[in-house]
Curated annotation (Swiss-Prot):
Assembly and binders: Homooctamer.
Enzyme class: oxidoreductase
SUPFAM superfamilies from the UniProt entry: Glyoxalase/Bleomycin resistance protein/Dihydroxybiphenyl dioxygenase
Stated name of the protein: 1,2-dihydroxynaphthalene dioxygenase
Organism: Sphingobium xenophagum
Pfam families associated with the record: BphC_D1, Glyoxalase
One Gene Ontology term from the biological process aspect of the record: naphthalene catabolic process
E.C. designation(s): 1.13.11.56
Catalytic reactions on record: naphthalene-1,2-diol + O2 = 2-hydroxychromene-2-carboxylate + H(+)
Function description: Involved in the naphthalene and naphthalenesulfonate catabolic pathway. Catalyzes the meta-cleavage of 1,2-dihydroxynaphthalene (1,2-DHN) to yield 2-hydroxychromene-2-carboxylic acid. Can also cleave 1,2,5-trihydroxynaphthalene (1,2,5-THN), 1,2,6-trihydroxynaphthalene (1,2,6-THN), 1,2,7-trihydroxynaphthalene (1,2,7-THN), 2,3-dihydroxybiphenyl, 3,4-dihydroxybiphenyl, catechol, 3-methylcatechol and 4-methylcatechol.
Protein keywords: Aromatic hydrocarbons catabolism, Dioxygenase, Iron, Metal-binding, Oxidoreductase, Repeat
Needed cofactors: Fe(2+)
Protein family: Belongs to the extradiol ring-cleavage dioxygenase family.
Length: 298
């Protein structure tokens, strides 16, 4: 049975391309690629043509997310599997695939209403070295682990878990977090490769489709530089620097120009063979700026 191998790319609808251009390059260290298209720019994190497309729009939210399959045979098998499960799948035109810089593309929607894509054959610009937007000591963790992970809006956690299992992901609840109101949050984490998780959900009601995108540096010093820049620019920090219990990553969460969160990280462990759960993080991750959907005690 075919399974997706990585979270390959994101498309984001943004209202302020200029703000994003500066943030992505000067804060995160991503390479900004402007090909003269009036409505979009691209962000590189490695040798792919892009990992993130920033598309000028009327909203600030996730526009789509792309899950990779290995080849045309696996792609066709996945389309068939999803269709047989009663999920509406539209195989995209050649023009739409070219727009995504892939060889094959299909579109569908997950149970939370999040625009989802499966694809194969991304364009890799091996002739163009990655050039970070600011000085960096290392690179981003991508390769077979994909872009990073996303926390998505899902009203029905079980339906979402079943959907992502169809795509080939594995996982379960990894935290039981006791909230001030007496309720217990039980976020659900799923992986499809060595990255500890590529998608998660179950944080409760969300205004936007996406709560945060996490990406990871290969070098601790790059996380430290990013943290310094965020503090110098007085960018809202929702969760202070801390270490997660599940993936052991050292991270912090700060606002992006679209009003949701990017999680900057380093040092995550690989996905374990068996599941376990935690009641709190190892240290840090104290709540700071409110209103970004991470007002939970970690």
């Amino acid at each position: 049975m075919s399974s997706v191998s990585e979270l390959g790319y994101l498309g984001m609808s943004v209202t302020d391309l200029d703000a994003w251009r500066a943030y992505a390059a000067e804060v995160a260290g991503m390479e900004v690629v402007d090909e003269g298209e009036s409505d979009r720019i691209y962000l590189r994190m490695d040798l792919w043509h892009h990992r993130i497309a920033l598309i000028k729009g009327d909203t600030d939210d996730l526009a789509y997310m792309g899950w990779r399959l290995g080849d045309p045979t696996e792609f066709e098998s996945m389309v068939e599997k999803l269709t047989n499960a009663g999920i509406a799948v539209t195989v995209a035109s050649d023009a739409e695939a070219r727009e995504r810089r892939v060889l094959g593309l299909a579109k569908l929607t997950d149970p939370g209403g999040n625009p989802t894509e499966i694809f194969y054959g991304p364009q890799v610009d091996a002739h163009k070295p990655f050039h970070p937007g600011r000085p960096m000591f290392g690179k981003f963790v991508t390769g077979s682990e994909g872009i990073g992970h996303c926390i998505l809006r899902q009203d029905d956690v079980e339906a979402a878990a079943a959907f992502y299992r169809l795509l080939g992901l594995r996982g379960s609840v990894e935290y039981q977090l006791h909230l001030p109101n007496g309720m217990v949050a039980m976020p659900y984490f799923m992986h499809c490769n060595e990255r500890q998780h590529s998608v998660a959900f179950g944080l409760g009601p969300m205004e936007k489709r996406i709560n945060h995108l996490m990406f990871e540096y290969t070098e601790l010093d790059d996380l430290g530089l990013a943290h310094d820049i965020v503090r110098e620019r007085q960018i809202d920090v929702a969760l202070q620097l801390g270490k997660h219990a599940n993936d052991l990553a050292l991270t912090f969460y700060c606002a992006n120009p679209s009003g949701w969160l990017w999680e900057f990280g380093w040092g995550a462990r690989k996905a374990p063979a068996q599941q376990e759960f935690y009641t709190r993080d190892i240290f840090g991750h104290g709540n700071e700026a409110q209103g970004y959907g991470m007002d939970v005690p970690l």
